[in-house]
Amino acid sequence: MDALLALHRRSRRTVVGLMSGTSLDGVDAALVQLDGSGPDLTMNPEAFVHIPYPTALRDLIRTNTDPASSSVQDVTRLDARLAETYAAAVDRVAAEADVDRGTVDLVGAHGQTVCHLPEPADCAGKDVRATLQLGNPSTLATRLGVPVVGNFRAADLALGGQGAPLVPYFDRVAFTAPDEARGLLNLGGIANLTVLPAGAAPDDVRAFDTGPANMVIDALAARLFDAPHDPDGRHANAGTPDHDLLADLLEGEYFRREPPKSTGRNDFGPDYVDRLLGAAQSRTLSPEDTMATATLLTAASVYQAYAQYVRPEQAIDELIVSGGGVHNDTLLRMLEEAFTPIPVRPTSDYGVAPDAKEALCFAVLAHEAVNGTPTNLPSVTGASARTPLGSLSVPGP
């Protein structure tokens, strides 16, 4: 208990943030020095690593994100197995930063989402909202001998929120500008957009998931080209989008739903990819044309969401992009064309590595959980109140 009190009272902490997203490509780990809280928080990133999932682990996770193929036994074992992977990632990023793991004060571990059900639904006579992220925080804390904050989404769901997106707290702290409105777009498996008016207060922030980013593109790359992703967007660049199919796709139920909203594999997973492929084949599209259409779907759905749900209230002066999608040159070109004349820039222009942003976010959320600082934003998630996010797991003596 004395150690926990000392951790709470300490303003400056060495924190590792861990993020494994819906793209299922592996775990990102960022080691960062954090000091202060809220708008006074200062951040000094020291190292970042990406640890790819072994093929067998990735395939097992993917199998267990599908209700038709998941099993309780597999999910239970994955909860422990992923904690071991996360422990290795902490060791790797500490080595990359050339620091002893014993100097790490805290770990923030998002976990691997296998199911996210933010809309209330009946469960044995009671409506509930629910989410499940694997990578047991107590197992991780025990392996590392370091306190771990995990289970970040449950408190917001308990307050009637979507439990997502959570990155907007980080966006506000790191990117709010006094004299311009900014859009922060993260292109992971899912695309999420944060809108920061000039000098944004917490209640001014708006954010939501716009739809798929890399999730559909990567699935099509696997199906059409036997590749984990479309490198640099080269297959999409070699094709021509089918605008009639694109128009049909943009009429999908999720795109028509008003914020606050969040999404994942339930909406844009294997079943969605099957339907898209079927529609492409009925139009006799080539693999390259199919990839071009799916890539444009990401860019067009982001812009459509901005035009419908953001611009009428708050136009942005620039769009700042992060996540794995920044490496897809075709996707970035399509975004630039859609948002012209608004400039599209990577977060690296502002001192935050695009691949590291989400891992840094969960380091910050863990740091603020120990501070007792509320980090959900009801204007974003729809929750009824603000609350600290995350549960603290502590190692044994």
UniProtKB/Swiss-Prot annotation:
The keyword NAD does not apply. Residues 373-397 are annotated as: Disordered. It comes from the Bacteria. It comes from Salinibacter ruber (strain DSM 13855 / M31). The gene is anmK. One of its GO terms (biological process) is 1,6-anhydro-N-acetyl-beta-muramic acid catabolic process. Transmembrane segments: none annotated. It is an enzyme of class 2 (transferase). Catalyzes the specific phosphorylation of 1,6-anhydro-N-acetylmuramic acid (anhMurNAc) with the simultaneous cleavage of the 1,6-anhydro ring, generating MurNAc-6-P. Is required for the utilization of anhMurNAc either imported from the medium or derived from its own cell wall murein, and thus plays a role in cell wall recycling. This is Anhydro-N-acetylmuramic acid kinase. Pathway: Amino-sugar metabolism; 1,6-anhydro-N-acetylmuramate degradation; Cell wall biogenesis; peptidoglycan recycling. Belongs to the anhydro-N-acetylmuramic acid kinase family. Gene3D superfamilies: 3.30.420.40. InterPro entries: Anhydro_N_Ac-Mur_kinase, ATPase_NBD. One of its GO terms (molecular function) is ATP binding.
